């Protein structure tokens, strides 16, 4: 997929995506606004079971509109199970979304409240599929754990990730990123909301069981500024910082949001 045909500007941003990706107007698009009064507590939802092996952290890559921290997903060493999931899902990468000011940047909102950013830990169904690229378009293919981020005290767990951004400042750069436990980025409570949705950027496949943590994590204004220092331009090109990379909430279209709490 060419990443140049979409972005977050006025010409190629979320409002324009449906021209190239008609599913953008589909019935199961993400993110959404989570209305807490309409989220149904479901006592059949299990607790999340998260088991991440820090040794599976592999590299950090500037993908142009964001950066990905990539994990070795060749075996079930870092997995998400339980919760709403019938199968075991293998961690393949995590990434962040942010905005051009501290009062917005998250993709999901809660009762209309926008957060400063959002962490997405992307997992694929290794019980049914042989790779992330096979699973990405299947209805039960992906599970994404979403964590809302609120501006506040600095987050020491996040700093190792942010410090690595200097080595991948421009689009296409990659660098080793090893021995990192992403569970250090999760809130202490794993109460969650869950619903069926999509990738939040092209190709926008409706293949995601979303699990959104009820509690947010904090990061400082300085840490947010480090995220915005990432460049979407390649080396040697005029510098274009990634100031904003979030899609606004999409219509629920009759879907149910369930709460574990």
Curated annotation (Swiss-Prot):
Residues 4-261 form the Alpha-carbonic anhydrase domain. Keywords: Acetylation, Cytoplasm, Lyase, Metal-binding, Zinc. It is found in: Cytoplasm. The modification N-acetylalanine is found at residue 2. It holds the Pfam family Carb_anhydrase. SUPFAM superfamilies: Carbonic anhydrase. Substrate binds at residues 200-201. Its cofactor is Zn(2+). InterPro entries: CA_dom, CA_dom_sf, Carbonic_anhydrase_a-class, Carbonic_anhydrase_a-class_CS. Zn(2+) binds at residues 95, 97, 120. Signal peptide: none annotated. Residues 239-261 are annotated as: Disordered. One of its GO terms (molecular function) is cyanamide hydratase activity. GO terms for cellular component: cytoplasm. Catalyzes the reversible hydration of carbon dioxide. Can hydrate cyanamide to urea. PANTHER family: CARBONIC ANHYDRASE, CARBONIC ANHYDRASE 1. Belongs to the alpha-carbonic anhydrase family. This is Carbonic anhydrase 1. It comes from Mus musculus (Mouse).
């Amino acid at each position: 997929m060419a990443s140049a045909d979409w972005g977050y500007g006025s010409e190629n941003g979320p409002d324009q995506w449906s021209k190239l990706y008609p599913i953008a107007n589909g019935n199961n698009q993400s993110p959404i606004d989570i209305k807490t009064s309409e989220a149904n507590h479901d006592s059949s939802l299990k607790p999340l079971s998260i088991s991440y092996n820090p040794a599976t952290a592999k590299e950090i890559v500037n993908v142009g509109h964001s950066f990905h921290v990539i994990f070795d997903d060749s075996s079930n060493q870092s997995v998400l199970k339980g919760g709403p999931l019938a199968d075991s899902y293998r961690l393949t990468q995590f990434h962040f979304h942010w905005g051009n000011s501290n009062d917005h940047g998250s993709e999901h909102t809660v009762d209309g409240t926008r957060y400063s950013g959002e962490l997405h830990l992307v997992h694929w169904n290794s019980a049914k599929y042989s790779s992330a690229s096979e699973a990405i378009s299947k209805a039960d293919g992906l599970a994404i754990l979403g964590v809302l981020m609120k501006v506040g005290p600095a987050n020491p767990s996040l700093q190792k990730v942010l410090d690595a951004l200097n080595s991948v400042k421009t689009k296409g750069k990659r660098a080793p990123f090893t021995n990192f436990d992403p569970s250090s980025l999760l809130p202490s409570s794993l109460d969650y909301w869950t619903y069926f949705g999509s990738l939040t950027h092209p190709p926008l496949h409706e293949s995601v069981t979303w699990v959104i943590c009820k509690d947010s994590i904090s990061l400082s204004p300085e840490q947010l500024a480090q995220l915005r220092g990432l460049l979407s331009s390649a080396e040697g090109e005029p510098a274009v910082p990634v100031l904003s990379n979030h899609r606004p909430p999409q219509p629920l279209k009759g879907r149910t949001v369930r709460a574990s709490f």
